[in-house]
Amino acid sequence: MNGVEQTCASLRTQIAATEAKLADLKRELEIAEQAAASHKQNAADAEGGSERRWPLLDEEYRRYGRQMIVPQLGIQGQLKLRSAKVLIVGAGGLGCPAALYLAGAGVGTLGLVDGDAVESSNLHRQVLHRTRNIGKLKVDSAIEYLKELNPHSKYIAHREHLAPEAAPEIFSNYDLILDCTDNPATRYLISDTAVLLGKPLVSASALRTEGQLMVLNNPPRPAGDKTGGPCYRCVFPKPPPANTVTSCADGGIVGPVVGTMGVLQALEAIKVITADETTTPPPPSLHIFSAYSTPLFRTIKLRSRRPNCAVCSAEASVTVDTVRSGSTDYIFFCGTTGPENLLSPEERITPLEYRTRHHDKEEKEPTIIDVREKVQYDICSLENSINIPISTILASASSSMSNGDSLADGVPALPSWVPPDVASSQSTDPVYVVCRLGNDSQVAVKKLKELGLDQGGKRVVADIRGGFRAWKEQVDPEWPEY
């Protein structure tokens, strides 16, 4: 880059920084002016020496008027919203739209719990965060946006991951809880704490193109009271096996899908807050959203509280003390989902070791089997690699076991997906298996060896440790990270 180009680049950088600073100042001025107007209105009311003529500020009538004229809300509903205290656990794909609409609706106090920082991979779906806030704590990024949207509400940041020892104290300051998290252990913790402290809970989840929504512990009743709403344990007495739990990072998520579920959480929260106290809440239901189905929504009626529930039945064993002390171990209850070493060190090779061993060699290239699903393989792939999705491998293995297929000598029959070069009993060329993170590839190696493709130890069948994430770090910095 020559001197003129450097000057241009420097000027562009300075202009961008100045424009960003100007935008920040404009936002600060707007918030200050709105706060000044509210302060002026409050001062005028106090100076009058009498009670306010109207329960809301002039600006609040203008701001919330369009929803106050809806019969289901009205002025009483708006006053309930203004006095409500709502806690949102998780400031991600669910928490962002939920917080956005609750703040817009005029909820008086919004608390946000999250210990994560904003990453670029969040931005396609977590709509409160902006590019310039990458690296900033999510709760601070979200509250920054919410204050611009509605300076009349109070926002409380809990800059931490929800932990059992802190959950009861945090929850006690709020009227309603929203579960916007994405892992089973935290879901059970949130539900247990909400039930024990008598807080209604709006819970949602989303993955790929589908989502689920429930309103739990509504109405909130003491343990043993059958008229209370069911809790998360009533619906799911046993957590799913840890190895079946898929995160958005692994399974993917369409932004509007998780956005839809977050908006529905906000809607259900508003319904709970503004409900007539003399009206019985609707029966508990599980609402299932599927973006590529017709109809989009299905509703399943849920049972009432389970008679033997560990939290909300008369025989409850979970208490505030067991939660706070750690006696109720949620990690143990749900199991861990961390990566496992299924193979011995001799059956694994790092990307750097692979490159050193086989790069620029005149001998035949080893076979690389990429076990990512085709949709990921189409994003990026190694030259001359073979795509055999892990789902195909596992499905054929299950089918072979059920059919008892085998050759005359007892060796399992080879599935049709095995490449001819790999299937050949004459070949001893090494076979390496790779995936995104280095977990599925280990499973695939075990299956290949069960099929006898390692020729009784004569052929190397190994996993590339750490998958393509490690490949990017050790071999190819330009490898797409998704």
From Swiss-Prot:
Q: Gene3D superfamilies from the xrefs?
A: NAD(P)-binding Rossmann-like Domain (3.40.50.720), Rhodanese-like domain (3.40.250.10)
UniProt family annotation: In the N-terminal section; belongs to the HesA/MoeB/ThiF family. UBA4 subfamily.
Where in the sequence is the active site? C248 (glycyl thioester intermediate), C435 (cysteine persulfide intermediate)
Q: Which SUPFAM superfamilies match?
A: Activating enzymes of the ubiquitin-like proteins
**Enzyme class at the top of the EC tree:** transferase
- Catalysed reactions, semicolon-separated: [molybdopterin-synthase sulfur-carrier protein]-C-terminal Gly-Gly + ATP + H(+) = [molybdopterin-synthase sulfur-carrier protein]-C-terminal Gly-Gly-AMP + diphosphate; [molybdopterin-synthase sulfur-carrier protein]-C-terminal Gly-Gly-AMP + S-sulfanyl-L-cysteinyl-[cysteine desulfurase] + AH2 = [molybdopterin-synthase sulfur-carrier protein]-C-terminal-Gly-aminoethanethioate + L-cysteinyl-[cysteine desulfurase] + A + AMP + 2 H(+)
Give a Gene Ontology cellular component term annotated to this protein: cytosol
Compartment annotation: Cytoplasm, Cytosol
Please give the function described in this protein's UniProt entry.
Plays a central role in 2-thiolation of mcm(5)S(2)U at tRNA wobble positions of cytosolic tRNA(Lys), tRNA(Glu) and tRNA(Gln). Also essential during biosynthesis of the molybdenum cofactor. Acts by mediating the C-terminal thiocarboxylation of sulfur carriers urm1 and mocs2a. Its N-terminus first activates urm1 and mocs2a as acyl-adenylates (-COAMP), then the persulfide sulfur on the catalytic cysteine is transferred to urm1 and mocs2a to form thiocarboxylation (-COSH) of their C-terminus.
UniProt name for this protein: Adenylyltransferase and sulfurtransferase uba4
Swiss-Prot/TrEMBL cofactor(s): Zn(2+)
EC number(s) stated in the UniProt entry for this protein:
2.7.7.80, 2.8.1.11
Q: Where does ATP bind?
A: G93, D114, S121, N122, L123, H124, R125, K138, D182, N183
